[in-house]
Each structure stands twice: as C-alpha cells, then as structure tokens.
C-alpha cells in the first residue's frame, strides 16, 4: 500500500539521517510510489534545506549534531510526534520571529519548518538550533547553563535573554496539557523558560501528543486560556479535548494512520 505524503517525507528523512545517501529507485519500491513522486518529495526537501539532489538520489544536508539530537530511531519510534510537528510547521505562515521551546515534539516541528531568509527563530534548545543552523534562517540561541540530558539552555541567564526579544508566535511542547491545570512541565527550569517565552509572544501554539492531554506535571507554566492553538493527535481523550476547546483553545488534530488533519485552518500572522 502506498504511503501518504506526510509520512513519506518522514521516511526519506529517516533514511538520509541513517545512511547519508538515498536512491530514488529503492525508495520508490519500498514506499510503493512512482520514482517521479519520490523526485518531487526530494525536491521539496531540498528547497527546505534538508537534502542535496544527486544523480539518481540525494545526500544529506545535515550536520553531525543532527545525528545526536534527532536520530533515525527517534523518528521511527515517534510517529505521532512526527505528524504533529509537520502539521504545525504547515500552519505557520507570515511570522517574522518565532520562539521555539524545548522538547522532542518541537524538535519535530523544527525539522519541517520551511526556510525563509526573513524569519528569525529564537530557541533555548540546542537540538533545535542544530536542526536549523544550516538552513536559510536567522537562528538565535539563548545563553545560560546547558542541561545535558536534553541539550537546552536554562537558568536565569536564559530567562533574561528571552526578554530581549518579542515574537509573533511561540511554539512550545509540554509535559502535561489539561483544562484543569493548564500547561505543566517536569522541572522548574524548563517551566521558567516557557513562561518567559509566553510573556514575550503574541500568539501561542502548543504541540502535544495525545498522552499529554489530561496529564499534569509538577511545574506550572500557564493556564490553558493562554493557549491559542493546540496541535495533537487522534489518541487524545475526547472528553479532555472538549474541555480544552470549551476554554477557548482551537484544537487541530492529526490522524496518525494517514496523516490527514481534522482541522485545516492555517495560522496567518499579520
């Protein structure tokens, strides 16, 4: 059975992350699509700065840091996060400055962000910075102490650095998202950075797979009413989704089996 386009490009990126070189004919057979379809996918990924086309295939346009922060195994084991990240990237349009937070789901978002020379991305995630560093973007990394377990900048210096910028949109992950407890994180350091980001942003998009909805962690970030748009997947508890929508949050859901979103409105930033 042919693979949907949203997942097909993920597969291509998985392969190039693992092998550095891919071949059109092999991918076409593996994914049950035509070679022309694979060429179109590779063309899009090349335009976004991920690949360089070669005769009969493509090679990686990614740094060794990418292998550490975002390897093929992580992609393969997180299909819901992949789809959430890609869908969120498609929803962003017209922003000139974006805050990108800390976490594995926002790393997926960063992977699929389109390149734009007039776009500035401010992040405390070294993984996100590594993903975007070779692209046609202006990337700003917050200072501060580095947490080695997730390669992120935290602490008072990082929080102070956030306040030097003003962004159209913030894209954050969360350990927990619920109508009752809002956005929560596992540690105070990440929560502090995300609180500062929200204060300095005009619009807040939160990315969370279904397991995070209805959950709460120890460190409070913000009430649910602070969220403008939540992107999640079809595994989310319907009752919790209804409560979050009732709080005024727009919810976009992706369906992991085929990648087709329930909602399709694109965010326009004026």
Where are these regions (language model features)?
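HTH-adjacent hinge/linker in prokaryotic transcriptional regulators
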Residues: 1-104, 110-122, 126, 132-137, ...
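Conserved phosphate- and dinucleotide-binding cores of soluble alpha/beta proteins
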Residues: 2-27, 32, 47, 80, ...
């Amino acid at each position: 059975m042919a693979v949907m386009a949203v997942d097909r490009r993920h597969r291509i990126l998985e392969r190039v992350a693992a092998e550095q070189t891919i071949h059109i004919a092999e991918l076409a057979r593996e994914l049950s699509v035509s070679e022309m379809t694979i060429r179109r996918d590779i063309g899009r990924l090349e335009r976004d700065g991920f690949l360089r086309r070669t005769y009969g295939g493509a090679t990686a346009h990614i740094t060794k840091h990418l292998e550490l922060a975002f390897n093929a195994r992580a992609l393969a084991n997180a299909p819901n996060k992949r789809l959430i990240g890609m869908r969120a990237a498609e929803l962003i349009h017209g922003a000139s400055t974006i805050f990108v937070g800390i976490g594995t789901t926002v790393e997926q978002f960063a992977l699929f962000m389109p390149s734009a020379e007039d776009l500035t991305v401010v992040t405390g995630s070294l993984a996100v910075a590594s993903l975007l560093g070779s692209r046609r973007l202006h990337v700003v990394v917050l200072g501060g102490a580095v947490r080695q377990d997730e390669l992120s900048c935290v602490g008072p210096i990082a929080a102070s650095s956030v306040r030097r910028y003003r962004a159209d949109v913030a894209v954050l992950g969360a350990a927990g998202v619920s109508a009752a407890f809002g956005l929560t994180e596992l540690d105070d350091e990440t929560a502090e950075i995300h609180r500062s980001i929200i204060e300095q942003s005009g619009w807040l998009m939160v990315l969370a797979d279904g397991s995070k909805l209805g959950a709460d962690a120890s460190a409070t970030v913000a009430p649910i009413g602070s969220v403008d748009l939540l992107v999640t997947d079809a595994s989310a508890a319907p009752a919790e989704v209804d409560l979050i929508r009732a709080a005024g949050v727009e919810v976009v859901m992706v369906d992991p089996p085929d990648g087709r979103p329930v909602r399709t409105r694109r965010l326009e930033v004026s």
